[in-house]
């Protein structure tokens, strides 16, 4: 088991001017939690393109609410996330987020609303080695929408440092997710979470793809009762992506918001 010790989200090694994975591949057997978190931090550096589908179920008083997130990514900077809501009976209920690294466009099919805005510039000149680990953030090759499952699954460094490392973590074994071997991590009472689950019986289980380091499943539970499950049902690193994948024009009748 480990407590809040891993603070290396921003410390990606640089060799000959280029960042590279600190751990190229996991050794046989089970790694330590710190080794696994370091391996996960560099996940996106193990592929040039990615296709991923995440199915999310949130269990509440009205039953399971389902969302599906379809992710397409090409380094550097090109990314597209389409979120659909199968549990919503409204026809055509989907949301799009697409970026080329300079402009981010969003579109809600249900409301016919869109936005087109410059990417927010990141703070520059902050050497991670000059600040405490918990005060640093991971700088991705290709950005994804902030505070979303696609961002967390593909860029897990921040989640490992700011959430999992605030609880008690241990590796409980292996599993298979999306047809691929995965390592299972358990975490009791991570404190950096929403207030309504900030309680001692809150538990998170994740699985980590053994080859690439992305998160492939997350299960949240309170008092032994599952409240949320998000699982990758399709994972294709280095997938062949059509040239049109990252092209988008707002449909006629779209209202653009600033």
Show where each model-derived region lies.
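Non-transmembrane domains of secretory- and envelope-associated proteins
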Residues: 2-30, 109-119, 124-126, 131, ...
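N-terminal mature ectodomain segment of secretory-pathway/periplasmic proteins
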Residues: 2-119, 184, 196, 203
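Intrinsically disordered, low-complexity boundary segments flanking structured domains
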Residues: 36-43, 155-158, 171-174, 216-221
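Short Pro/Gly-enriched beta-strand edge/turn motifs at strand-loop
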Residues: 52-55, 153-156, 186-191
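Short secondary-structure transition/capping segments
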Residues: 94-103, 131-138, 257-258
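Solvent-exposed helix/loop surface patches that form functional interfaces
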Residues: 125-177
């Amino acid at each position: 088991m480990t407590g809040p010790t891993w603070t290396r989200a921003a410390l990606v090694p640089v060799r000959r001017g280029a960042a590279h994975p600190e751990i190229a591949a996991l050794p046989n057997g089970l790694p330590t939690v710190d080794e696994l978190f370091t391996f996960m931090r560099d996940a996106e550096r193990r592929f040039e393109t990615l296709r991923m589908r995440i199915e999310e179920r949130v269990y509440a008083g009205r039953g399971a609410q389902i969302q599906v997130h379809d992710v397409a990514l090409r380094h550097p900077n090109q990314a597209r996330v389409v979120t659909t809501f199968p549990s919503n009976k409204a026809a055509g209920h989907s949301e799009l987020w697409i970026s080329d690294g300079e402009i981010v466009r969003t579109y809600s099919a249900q409301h016919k609303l869109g936005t087109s805005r410059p990417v927010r510039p990141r703070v520059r000149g902050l050497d991670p080695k000059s600040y405490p680990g918990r005060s640093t953030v991971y700088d991705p090759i290709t950005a994804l929408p902030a505070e979303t499952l696609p961002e967390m699954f593909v860029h897990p460094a921040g989640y490992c440092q700011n959430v999992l490392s605030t609880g008690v973590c241990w590796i409980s074994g292996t599993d298979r997710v999306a047809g691929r071997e995965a390592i299972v991590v358990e975490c009791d009472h991570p404190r950096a979470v929403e207030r309504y689950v900030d309680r001692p019986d809150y538990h998170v289980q994740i699985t980590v793809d053994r080859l690439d380091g992305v998160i492939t499943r997350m299960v949240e539970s309170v008092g032994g009762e599952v409240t949320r499950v998000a699982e990758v049902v399709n994972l294709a690193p280095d997938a062949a992506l059509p040239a049109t994948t990252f092209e988008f024009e707002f449909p006629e009748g779209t209202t653009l918001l600033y």
